[in-house]
UniProtKB/Swiss-Prot annotation:
Subcellular localization(s) per the UniProt record: Secreted
Keywords on record: Disulfide bond, Ion channel impairing toxin, Knottin, Secreted, Toxin
Function description: Probable ion channel inhibitor.
UniProt key word Disulfide bond: yes
Entry superkingdom: Eukaryota
Disulfide bonds: 2-16, 9-21, 15-28
A GO molecular function held by the record: toxin activity
Keyword Nucleotide-binding: no
Domain notes: The presence of a 'disulfide through disulfide knot' structurally defines this protein as a knottin.
GO CC term, one of those recorded: extracellular region
Tissue-wise expression: Expressed by the venom gland.
Taxonomic classification: Eukaryota, Metazoa, Ecdysozoa, Arthropoda, Chelicerata
Entry protein name: Jingzhaotoxin F7-15.33
Family note: Belongs to the neurotoxin 10 (Hwtx-1) family.
Amino acid sequence: LCSREGEFCYKLRKCCAGFYCKAFVLHCYRN
């Protein structure tokens, strides 16, 4: 299970390939 662009990310739910977890807002953004 992974988060896509604009979705919440945290320790147990990483971002999908091609995305990164932006600090503080904890949302996935496109690389």
